Swiss-Prot record:
InterPro entries: Ribosomal_uL5, Ribosomal_uL5_bac-type, Ribosomal_uL5_C, Ribosomal_uL5_CS, Ribosomal_uL5_dom_sf, Ribosomal_uL5_N. Belongs to the universal ribosomal protein uL5 family. It comes from Bacillus cereus (strain AH187). It holds the Pfam family Ribosomal_L5_C. Part of the 50S ribosomal subunit; part of the 5S rRNA/L5/L18/L25 subcomplex. Contacts the 5S rRNA and the P site tRNA. Forms a bridge to the 30S subunit in the 70S ribosome. This is Large ribosomal subunit protein uL5. This is one of the proteins that bind and probably mediate the attachment of the 5S RNA into the large ribosomal subunit, where it forms part of the central protuberance. In the 70S ribosome it contacts protein S13 of the 30S subunit (bridge B1b), connecting the 2 subunits; this bridge is implicated in subunit movement. Contacts the P site tRNA; the 5S rRNA and some of its associated proteins might help stabilize positioning of ribosome-bound tRNAs. Keywords: Ribonucleoprotein, Ribosomal protein, RNA-binding, rRNA-binding, tRNA-binding. PROSITE patterns: RIBOSOMAL_L5 (PS00358). The gene is rplE.
Length: 179
């Protein structure tokens, strides 16, 4: 079993139950899924850029991403409806815990001038969104093979009802929030 999953069952669940006075173990919030999304703006003129982004996302997540397409045409961006403009991957279960563990213990500390992630990025429903400016912070990405530095959005979806519960859950998992 994954290190974080074990920690969740043995340490985090009892801690959250006592802190928020839950009656049942099923009320304890847990991480439902992690969605990694990257937009490739230059895919409009250069289709090779999207292939590179998909390849990098596959290495980072360990799972093949799905290509996202434009919902509507925007003339200013030379964009037609249905054109491929990004990629996203949804992680659940074992892979989700592996990725989260890697993100918290390896990738985030590699960010330049890292002082912790913002406490304000919760959406009011207990989900946390994190923006990463470059894909080089992940250990799987080889610096020499990167054609262009790309950012990505990482959304951590929890079953928590409030932001306070979600923040406590992620803090227990080791998410480095700003002081």
């Amino acid at each position: 079993m994954n290190r974080l999953k074990e920690k969740f069952q043995k340490e985090i669940t009892p801690a959250l139950m006592s802190k928020f006075n839950y009656k049942s173990v099923m009320q304890v919030p847990k991480i439902e899924k992690i969605v990694i999304n990257t937009g490739v703006g230059d895919a409009v003129s250069n289709s090779k850029a999207l292939d590179n982004a998909v390849e990098e996302l596959t290495q980072i997540a360990g799972q093949k991403p799905v290509v996202t397409r434009a919902k509507k045409s925007i003339a200013g961006f030379r964009l037609r409806e249905g054109m491929p403009i990004g990629a996203k991957v949804t992680l659940r279960g074992e892979q989700m815990y592996e990725f989260f563990d890697k993100l918290v213990s390896v990738s985030l500390p590699r960010v330049r001038d890292f002082r912790g992630v913002s406490k304000k990025s919760f959406d009011g429903r207990g989900n946390y969104t994190l923006g990463v400016k470059e894909q080089l912070i992940f250990p799987e990405i080889d610096y020499d093979k990167v054609s262009k530095v790309r950012g990505m959005d990482i959304v951590i979806v929890t079953t928590a009802n409030t932001d306070e519960e979600a923040r406590e859950l992620l803090t227990q998992f080791g998410m480095p929030f700003q002081k």
